[in-house]
Structures are given as structure tokens and as C-alpha cells.
Curated annotation (Swiss-Prot):
GO terms for biological process: DNA-templated DNA replication; error-prone translesion synthesis; SOS response. This is DNA polymerase IV. The record marks 13 as: Substrate discrimination. Its main location: cytoplasm. Pfam families: IMS (PF00817), IMS_C (PF11799), IMS_HHH_1 (PF21999). The active site is at residue 104.
Length: 351
């Protein structure tokens, strides 16, 4: 049985700012773009979250909820430096590390001899070491598979951890809401609940064939996760090549204005996700995806050095006009392709 730890730093960007400027610790702060430039919030500290300020929220809305919010532009070199230090701490316990972004990672400690091989004690020691050396707090989840470790890391935030032992997995899954499973969004969760599927326990009673017929590949993943099955390895060689965000509508859309409104809502989340893995926002390409009511889909992208909403909207409009052919649209997606590390190095050297 594997021993997987998911470590997630607590409001990472904001935590670095509060560490470096103690005057910020007890006041609401957020990292993000200005209201005048229609910026969005990247992250907020817990005092700000009490007012409802959240990641990916437009800055203007955040300031309405919390007029005395202190807005900071972000110091991405400082965040990257802290992230590198955290990753070095991970490497003291295992070489099997899969970074997901600057502030979270999976660790496979199945074969680790530290702490007598106890994943629970390793997670505690890692969190304590991070605090001792960086004065930052982390939360952790421990489980025999990746998706449960990720869910567990959110159970006792901030500055806590939650352990799901192999023996506890069946009982934990019985009441686990499907919406908690990574990859099950609000629209999917609503559709599942509409047919009586709210928890993993509900899905366990379903025939896999029926789920496959109704939901395709997603149905299989849903069934496997509800049984506690997740065979994905912690991939130390993982190189993230793209970042994306998409939305499946409850009803098909037929007017460009509806599509544009969805892009306006998706863009802040794309910006937030990209900032977590690429703080300088440098990219190779950006593009859009449309899926039609006949389940055919099309993508269009082109070279662009930085994330740019106006260009994405223009690309989407061109795709809408040229490829829709009168069909309804059931899904809208935005994505960016990241720079190859070798190409990025060449670009930096050429500056």
C-alpha cells in the first residue's frame, strides 16, 4: 500500500508578504491587480477571507466586500525563492516529488525510512521544518492514493493535517460529496445530484456500464474514485505543458454575447492558475476551445508571449463565427501552452 502526502501552503503569496512585513499580519490583504486595470485577486489572507474575498475574484468586487483591503501587486521573485526552499525540504525525505504549482506538491514516501517510515510523522516533520526555516505554515493530507491525499490536505486548514489510513478509506468515501473529488465541477455536481448521485456511496451502488453510457470517460473516473481507486503515480518527471480552464453549460448557448460573458468569467481563473505555476505569466501560445451540441469540438490558438484577455476574446469570436455553423455551444474553454524550459532559457539569454 502506498503512502502519499499532499502538501499545500496556506495562502502562500499573502503569507510571504505577512512574513516579510509583520504590520500586514492582522489586517485584510490580497495579492492582485488594481481595480482601475480590471485586475483579479490571486490570493487573500484569512482576515480578508472573512469578508468574502476569494481567489479569482475581480479586484473591484473584493474592494466592495472589504473597502479597507490592502492590495499588493505581488513579488514573484520572493514567492519563487520560498517555493524552491520548500521543494528542497521535500527532497530531504523523498526523491519522488510531483510539484503542482509554487505552493503545493505530492510526495510519495512509501519507501522512506525517515520517522520510522510513518507518513503521518513525516508530514508533521515537513510542516514543522517549513515553519522553522521559512516562518510559513503548510497543511498536509496523508492517504494511500493521490486524490484522497489532496482532499485530506484541505480538511484541517490552515496549519493542520488530516490522515486517511487504508482501513478508513471505505467509511470516508461513503459520505464524501462528489463535489469534493478533484475534477468534479459545480455543473457536473449539479447534474449528478439531479439523478440522485451526491456522494461516493451513491455512486458505489451504480452499475459501471450505466455510468459509462451516460458520462463516458468521466463516468469511469467517477466510479473509480468512488471506490477509492487512483492508480496515478507521483510523477517526479512531470513537466507541466499547459494550463487551462473550461466550463460546461447547463444549457447550450446560441449567442456570441453569452460566450463572451463566459470568457469574462473564466479568464480570472485562468490568470490565477497560470500565476501559480508561472508567476511571470510568460507563455508560448494561448487559445480557445468550443464544444458544440453534437459533441464535436474545435480549438484555435496562436503564438502570444503573455496572457491577454482581449486577444483571447478576439480568437474566440473568430472561432465562433467561422466554425460554429449554427450549432449550439455546450462548452467554452481557455488555455495556454507553456514555454519549453530550453526555449525559455534561450529567450532569457537573448534579452
Amino acid at each position: 500500500m502506498r503512502k502519499i502526502i499532499h502538501v499545500d501552503m496556506d495562502c502562500f503569496f499573502a503569507a510571504v508578504e505577512m512574513r516579510d512585513n509583520p504590520a500586514l499580519r492582522d489586517i485584510p490583504i490580497a495579492i492582485g491587480g488594481s481595480r482601475e486595470r480590471r485586475g483579479v485577486i490571486s490570493t487573500a489572507n484569512y482576515p480578508a477571507r472573512k469578508f468574502g474575498v476569494r481567489s479569482a475574484m475581480p479586484t473591484g468586487m473584493a474592494l466592495k466586500l472589504c473597502p479597507h483591503l490592502t492590495l499588493l501587486p505581488g513579488r514573484f521573485d520572493a514567492y519563487k525563492e520560498a517555493s524552491n526552499h520548500i521543494r528542497e525540504i521535500f527532497s530531504r525525505y523523498t526523491s519522488r516529488i510531483e510539484p503542482l504549482s509554487l505552493d503545493e506538491a505530492y510526495l510519495d514516501v512509501t519507501d522512506s525510512v525517515h520517522c520510522h517510515g510513518s507518513a503521518t510523522l513525516i508530514a508533521q516533520e515537513i510542516r514543522q521544518t517549513i515553519f522553522n526555516e521559512l516562518q510559513l505554515t503548510a497543511s498536509a493530507g496523508v492517504a494511500p492514493v493521490k486524490f484522497l491525499a489532496k482532499i485530506a490536505s484541505d480538511m484541517n486548514k490552515p496549519n493542520g493535517q488530516f490522515v486517511i489510513t487504508p482501513a478508513e478509506v471505505p467509511a470516508f468515501l461513503q459520505t464524501l460529496p462528489l463535489a469534493k473529488i478533484p475534477g468534479v465541477g459545480k455543473v457536473s455536481a449539479a447534474k449528478l445530484e439531479a439523478i440522485g448521485l451526491r456522494t461516493c456511496g451513491d455512486v458505489q451502488k451504480c452499475d459501471l456500464v450505466i455510468l459509462l453510457k451516460r458520462f463516458g470517460k468521466f463516468g469511469r473516473i467517477l466510479w473509480e474514485r468512488s471506490q477509492g481507486i487512483d492508480e496515478r503515480d507521483v510523477n517526479s518527471e512531470r513537466l507541466r505543458k499547459s494550463v487551462g480552464v473550461e466550463r460546461t453549460m447547463a444549457e447550450d448557448i446560441h449567442h456570441w454575447s453569452e460566450c463572451e460573458a463566459i470568457i469574462e468569467r473564466l479568464y480570472p481563473e485562468l490568470e490565477r492558475r497560470l500565476a501559480k505555476v508561472k508567476p511571470d505569466l510568460l507563455i508560448a501560445r494561448q487559445g480557445v476551445k468550443l464544444k458544440f451540441d453534437d459533441f464535436q469540438q474545435t480549438t484555435q490558438e496562436h503564438v502570444w508571449p503573455r496572457l491577454n484577455k482581449a486577444d483571447l476574446i478576439a480568437t474566440a469570436r473568430k472561432t465562433w463565427d467561422e466554425r460554429r455553423g449554427g450549432r449550439g455551444v455546450r462548452l467554452v474553454g481557455l488555455h495556454v501552452t507553456l514555454l519549453d524550459p530550453q526555449m525559455e532559457r534561450q529567450l532569457v539569454l537573448g534579452l
